[in-house]
UniProtKB/Swiss-Prot annotation:
It is found in: Nucleus. This is Heterogeneous nuclear ribonucleoprotein C. The gene is HNRNPC. Binds pre-mRNA and nucleates the assembly of 40S hnRNP particles. Interacts with poly-U tracts in the 3'-UTR or 5'-UTR of mRNA and modulates the stability and the level of translation of bound mRNA molecules. Single HNRNPC tetramers bind 230-240 nucleotides. Trimers of HNRNPC tetramers bind 700 nucleotides. May play a role in the early steps of spliceosome assembly and pre-mRNA splicing. There is a cross-link at residue 232 (Glycyl lysine isopeptide (Lys-Gly) (interchain with G-Cter in SUMO1)). Residues 255-276, 288-306 have a biased composition (Acidic residues). The keyword Nucleus applies. Residues 16-87 form the RRM domain. There is a cross-link at residue 250 (Glycyl lysine isopeptide (Lys-Gly) (interchain with G-Cter in SUMO)). It comes from Oryctolagus cuniculus (Rabbit).
């Protein structure tokens, strides 16, 4: 751990010393400060006080690297304000003026070498640095917010005094400025409104065209559906008529076949009857011939007997 001595006034020590302002010392300790700033070089001294701290490096290059790397960093909820102790920042605030470290250290003698009683030397160093910080900044670490801007008071019409002409002129100027700004803002708003209206009209036209196209598509689809239904009904009717015709033809053909079959049967019956009659006649003729033959035989036998 580095020593607590950070108040040497020789130029080399002052140029290699880093001031750390706006430090939350309720949370951040000396070991934390050394751990953060030791990465930029060897630390030979480190002192932490109420709201600020000092880090003493061996050379100026390490100190400048630490300022460049850690200035503006947020630690424990507060943004650090870091700079070289010999080169304070110029525009740190309006309420106070920052003095150079050389002026602050000029009339203060250097502390003697650290004695075995470290507590006494630490107390002296702490008091010296606190006095340095208090005199260096005559304003609080956190600048209070600016007061609210008061509205311009408009003088009444009854107060017509020559001594208030300058005030009236100022108020008039403020009014004119406000009116000019309001007119500009009104013009800007009017232009914006016109542009918005144009965009809305374009969008409306596009939407209307889309709706019209959708309606056309729906109408075409409905027409196509009706045509398809009509075609289907016509096809069904034609198919049904064809089926009816086919059935009629079949019925007629079947009826003709039946008639022809009946006629054929009748003809067959007639032929059969004719054939039967012929056969009967032949049989009768055969019987007659046989009887005549027998008679002839009988007559021949009688003649022989006589």
């Amino acid at each position: 751990m580095a020593s607590n001595v950070t108040n040497k006034t020789d130029p080399r020590s002052m140029n290699s010393r880093v001031f750390i302002g706006n430090l939350n010392t309720l949370v951040v300790k000396k070991s934390d400060v050394e751990a953060i700033f030791s990465k930029y070089g060897k630390i030979v001294g480190c002192s932490v006080h109420k709201g600020f701290a000092f880090v003493q490096y061996v050379n100026e290059r390490n100190a400048r690297a630490a300022v460049a790397g850690e200035d503006g960093r947020m630690i424990a909820g507060q943004v650090l304000d870091i700079n070289l102790a010999a080169e304070p920042k110029v525009n740190r605030g309006k309420a106070g003026v920052k003095r150079s470290a050389a002026e602050m250290y000029g009339s203060v003698p250097e502390h003697p070498s650290p004695s075995p009683l470290l507590s006494s030397s630490f107390d002296l160093d702490y008091d010296f640095q606190r006095d340095y910080y208090d005199r260096m900044y005559s304003y609080p670490a956190r600048v209070p917010p600016p007061p609210p801007i008061a509205r311009a008071v408009v003088p009444s019409k009854r107060q017509r005094v020559s001594g208030n002409t300058s005030r009236r002129g100022k108020s008039f100027n403020s009014k004119s400025g406000q009116r000019g700004s309001s007119s500009k803002s009104g013009k800007l708003k009017g232009d914006d409104l016109q542009a918005i209206k144009k965009e809305l009209t374009q969008i409306k036209q596009k939407v209307d065209s889309l709706l019209e196209s959708l309606e056309k598509i729906e109408k075409e689809q409905s027409k196509q559906g009706v045509e398809m239904k009509n075609d289907k009904s016509e096809e069904e009717q034609s198919s049904s008529s064809q089926k009816k015709d086919e059935t009629n033809v079949k019925m007629e053909s079947e009826g003709g076949a039946d008639d022809s079959a009946e006629e054929g049967d009748l003809l067959d019956d007639d032929d059969n009857e004719d054939r039967g009659d012929d056969q009967l006649e032949l049989i009768k003729d055969d019987e007659k011939e046989a009887e005549e033959g027998e008679d002839d035989r009988d007559s021949a036998n009688g003649e022989d007997d006589s």
